[in-house]
From Swiss-Prot:
Similarity comment: Belongs to the alphaherpesvirinae HHV-1 UL4 family.
One Pfam short name: Herpes_UL4
InterPro entries linked: Herpes_UL4 (IPR004958)
UniProt keyword Glycoprotein present: no
The keyword ATP-binding appears for this protein: no
GO cellular component: host cell nucleus
Location(s), subcellular: Host nucleus
Protein's UniProt name: Nuclear protein UL4
Chain coiled-coil ranges: none
UniProt source species: Human herpesvirus 1 (strain 17)
Entry keyword set: Host nucleus
């Protein structure tokens, strides 16, 4: 396998389970954390940003594995579409690690939504008080077909999230996600939506 082109890594410190937010009998992990960091490495470039207090949800669903990081001012949601629909979100209590190979993924922040047909692996590692979430993405997405570029035959865009005005997320840390999504040549889902509405 070739060297990974993109890595998105979260370190969420002083994490503890949030029982009030957990759904019974659901394959999910819900935690709150005091602070954290997000590091992104793309083709030899690296950037790291601090995250304030927030929450994290990791949930296995029929449409893939969802990872949501919400720090109020800083928000990002990921959906990883796995290679095996029967995969379960089961924490390995002995190894304190969970791995989820995926074939494609979708990312949404407060100001940008994108999808990618690149494969990779998501790993989640638990320690006594820290959660490490790492998405390692290999290769480049396939070139778009002319039909898909105009929204013909393309999957519908992921649902948008309710978010405040643009001024709230035009900060350096929020700009990082936009920069990375463009750098790894993703197809903005918002662009798909605009073209579909205009057609």
């Amino acid at each position: 396998m070739s060297n990974p082109q993109t890595t998105i890594a979260y370190s969420l410190c002083h994490a503890r389970a949030s029982l009030t937010s957990a759904l019974p009998d659901a394959a999910q992990v819900v935690h709150v954390f005091e602070y954290g960091t997000r590091a992104i490495m793309v083709r030899g470039r690296e950037r790291q940003d601090r995250l304030p207090r927030g929450g994290v949800v990791i949930q296995h669903t029929p449409i893939g594995l969802l990872v949501i990081i919400d720090c109020r001012a800083e928000f990002c949601a990921y959906r990883f579409i796995g290679r095996d629909s029967n995969q379960k979100l089961e924490r390995g209590w002995d190894a304190h690690m969970y791995a989820y190979p995926f074939d494609s993924w979708v990312s949404s922040s407060r100001g940008e939504s994108a999808r990618s047909a690149t494969a990779g692996i998501l790993t989640v590692v638990w320690t006594a008080d820290t959660i490490y979430i790492t998405a390692t993405i290999y290769g480049s997405p396939p070139e778009e077909t002319p039909g898909a570029a105009h929204g013909v035959g393309a999957a519908p865009p992921p649902p948008t999230t309710a978010c405040p005005g643009t001024a709230e997320f035009l900060q350096p840390t929020a700009d990082l996600l936009v920069e990375v999504l463009r750098e790894i040549q993703l197809s903005p889902a918002l662009e798909y939506a605009d073209k579909l509405l205009g057609s």
